[in-house]
Amino acid sequence: MSTTFCSSVSMQATSLAATTRISFQKPALVSTTNLSFNLRRSIPTRFSISCAAKPETVEKVSKIVKKQLSLKDDQKVVAETKFADLGADSLDTVEIVMGLEEEFDIEMAEEKAQKIATVEEAAELIEELVQLKK
């Protein structure tokens, strides 16, 4: 039988409202024979980010982004792609927005257009604006 002697255990919980301190000063005898620990490291599984925008909208936005940034045809541009990762600066982003407005026959408010950072965000905003237009 394996045992561990614990002379003092102290825990402290802090919250915005108050501080609570719990302290056990009496010796405690803890048996470790029936304890088991799962020490296997969890391996992260692949995950994908799903967007609310339709795949066709994402595809159109991707093509416009590639065209506006003069990217090669084999360059991968997907929903999660950030404009900055493609080398786009603020002027490029304005040109992308103008291309999107022309393609989808919409007008984006400047505040909303400035918040767009990914293909997914652009596609979601476009679908929202198209729905409002109807």
Curated annotation (Swiss-Prot):
In terms of InterPro entries, this protein maps to: ACP, ACP-like_sf, ACP_chloroplastic, PKS_PP-bd, PP-bd_ACP, Ppantetheine_attach_site
> Which NCBIfam families does the UniProt entry name for this protein?
acyl_carrier, PRK00982.1-2
Query: What Gene Ontology cellular-component terms does the record carry?
Result: chloroplast
Biological function: Carrier of the growing fatty acid chain in fatty acid biosynthesis.
Assigned protein family: Belongs to the acyl carrier protein (ACP) family.
- Functional pathway: Lipid metabolism; fatty acid biosynthesis
Instruction: Kindly list any coiled-coil regions of this protein.
Output: none
Q: Which UniProt keywords apply?
A: Chloroplast, Fatty acid biosynthesis, Fatty acid metabolism, Lipid biosynthesis, Lipid metabolism, Phosphopantetheine, Phosphoprotein, Plastid, Transit peptide
Q: Which organism is it from?
A: Brassica campestris (Field mustard)
User: What name does the UniProt record give this protein?
Assistant: Acyl carrier protein SF2, chloroplastic
The Carrier domain, residue ranges: 55-130
> Transit peptide: which range?
1-51
- Domain of life, per UniProt, equals Eukaryota
- A GO molecular function for this record? acyl carrier activity
